[in-house]
């Protein structure tokens, strides 16, 4: 009994290691969650959108209606926001400034989420914002659907994700301007 007491930690550790080694589903779960086994195909799929992700009808709030697929083959600044979202509202002046300086190089698509048309139009008019704003009229794919607001993607001509930002950012900063310049050449 004294052997067991002295070595209890080692015995428990041995049992845990044996369980992981012998129970295949548990081993696969741990490997999937913590393992570094990404394949090139998986990395590419996770760092780019597919054609079906762009199959979204958009109702224009301050521009004509469009389809997200209209922007394939171009550099796209895609922002998900809401008038109800304080960080989104904080970010807007920098997005508007970026839009005014870079709209010849990049297509801007700002999608208001969980919002009413009247609230979006009022927000744009009160602040004199001109960046193109839409409300999605068809469901977004799980890959495109944001987890937090604001979420912004800069998407390349081949639907690759060049940048993803899950928080407020000063889009008019020198770094952001330089990034947009570098990807839009």
Predicted regions and their residues:
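N-terminal targeting signals for export/organelle localization
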Residues: 1-53
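A short beta-strand-turn-helix
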Residues: 50, 55-76
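Conserved redox-active cysteine motifs that mediate thiol-disulfide chemistry
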Residues: 72, 80-97
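Active-site acidic short loop of glycosyltransferases
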Residues: 72-74, 104, 129-130, 146-147
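Structural cue for short, hydrophobic secondary-structure segments
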Residues: 77-81, 112
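Structural microenvironment flanking redox-active thiols in thiol-disulfide oxidoreductases
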Residues: 89-127, 135-143, 178
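Thiol/disulfide oxidoreductase modules built on the thioredoxin-like
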Residues: 122-129, 135-183
């Amino acid at each position: 009994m004294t052997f067991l007491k002295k070595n209890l930690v080692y015995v428990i550790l041995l049992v845990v290691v044996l369980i992981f080694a012998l129970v295949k589903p548990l081993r696969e779960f741990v490997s999937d969650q913590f393992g570094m086994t990404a394949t090139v195909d998986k990395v590419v799929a996770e760092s780019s959108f597919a054609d079906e992700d762009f199959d979204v009808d958009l109702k224009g709030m301050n521009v004509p209606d469009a389809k997200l697929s209209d922007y394939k083959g171009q550099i796209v600044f895609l922002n998900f926001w809401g008038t109800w979202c304080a960080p989104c509202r904080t970010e807007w002046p920098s997005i508007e400034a970026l839009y005014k300086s870079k709209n010849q190089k990049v297509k801007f698509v700002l999608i208001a989420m969980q919002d009413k048309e009247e609230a979006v139009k009022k927000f744009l008019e009160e602040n004199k914002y001109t960046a193109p704003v839409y409300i999605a009229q068809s469901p977004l794919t799980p890959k495109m659907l944001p987890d937090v607001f604001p979420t912004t993607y800069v998407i390349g001509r081949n639907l690759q994700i060049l940048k993803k930002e899950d928080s407020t950012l000063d889009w008019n900063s020198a770094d952001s301007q330089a990034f947009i310049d570098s990807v839009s050449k």
